[in-house]
Swiss-Prot record:
UniProt entry tagged with the keyword Metal-binding: yes
Lineage: Bacteria, Pseudomonadati, Spirochaetota, Spirochaetia, Spirochaetales
EC number: 3.6.1.66
Keywords of this entry: Hydrolase, Magnesium, Metal-binding, Nucleotide metabolism, Nucleotide-binding
Family: Belongs to the HAM1 NTPase family.
Residues engaged in binding substrate: 22-27, 83, 165-168, 188, 193-194
A GO cellular-component term linked to this record: cytosol
Subunit structure comment from the entry: Homodimer.
Active site (UniProt): 82 (proton acceptor)
One GO process term, biological-process aspect: nucleotide metabolic process
The protein's name: dITP/XTP pyrophosphatase
Signal peptide: none
């Protein structure tokens, strides 16, 4: 199953408001589409001034550092990631320093960083590279949920495409014949390193929440059986949401609607 499909079907991941430990609007758009069952919030949109130094030696260290820094401020679920481009011929550089690559030479824009990297790779035959992403979800007292995604590709000789951000215009996917910057966000979310990391994260989160989901399904089944007691399908509570209805009542009606559907299946069997 493709990463984006699993994430959309992961119904056991209960709704959360999650703060993204970044002020990058492109990352926000990607994670929002990868976790459609949750609301992803940027700190700046909530009036929070957030900054993390990102001075770790690994992707995980940087991601955890960002998650811890924002959680200390919001005390709510926090999603953080650190990613970078690792070029085989450069011994994995720029790696964890991808966002600051060339800063010592006065390079501070994505375009300038890509140009510097292409100059470093001029004349080299081995242009294999990887996009790596490590994402962490901090929920408080429970252990961190961690997901890692790797996407293999080839470094181009020139920039192509206008979508995406960072090094996307020079990262070519051989099996598609296009760079990340030439893919729509829906296409990118099927193959990207960030999508794969989000998939691992969702799987871990689903396993953590499985006991709660099973309790809910058991309650649902008991309600359905009560409706079919004696071989007769009994009506449940009305499910249509009415004006002025409280959120709790709406949830109860939604539960009974699901229970009735389950009861019909039992009755037919």
């Amino acid at each position: 199953m493709r990463a984006v499909d699993f994430l959309r079907r992961a119904t056991v991941c209960w709704y959360m408001r999650i703060y993204l430990a970044s002020n990058n609007a492109h990352k926000h758009a990607e994670f929002s589409s990868l976790f459609p069952m949750h609301t992803i919030l940027l700190p700046k949109d909530e009036g929070i001034d957030f900054f993390s130094p990102e001075d770790g030696s690994t992707f995980f260290a940087n991601a955890r550092q960002k998650a811890d820094a924002l959680y200390d401020v919001v005390h709510a679920p926090v999603l953080a990631d650190d990613s970078g481009l690792c070029v085989d011929a450069l011994d994995g550089d720029p790696g964890v320093h991808s966002a600051r690559f060339g800063a010592q030479h006065g390079v501070h824009t994505d375009t300038a960083r890509m140009q510097l990297l292409l100059e470093r790779m001029h004349g080299r035959q081995d242009r294999a590279c990887s996009f790596v992403c490590v994402a962490v979800l901090k929920l408080g007292s429970v252990p961190l949920c961690v997901g890692r995604g790797v996407c293999r590709g080839v470094l181009t000789t020139e920039m192509s495409g206008v979508e995406g951000f960072g090094y996307d215009p020079i990262f070519l996917l051989p099996h598609l014949g296009r760079t990340f910057a030439q893919l729509s966000i829906e296409e990118k979310n099927r193959v990207s390193h960030r999508a794969l990391a989000a998939l691992r994260l969702a799987q871990v989160l689903a396993m953590m929440q499985l006991p709660r989901a099973l309790r809910y399904e058991l309650k649902l089944l008991r309600g359905a059986r009560r409706m079919t007691r004696g071989g007769v399908l009994r009506p449940g509570a009305p499910c249509a949401q009415r004006k002025g209805q409280t959120a709790q009542t709406a949830r109860r009606h939604k539960f009974y609607a699901r229970a009735r559907r389950c009861a019909r299946r039992i009755h037919r069997a």
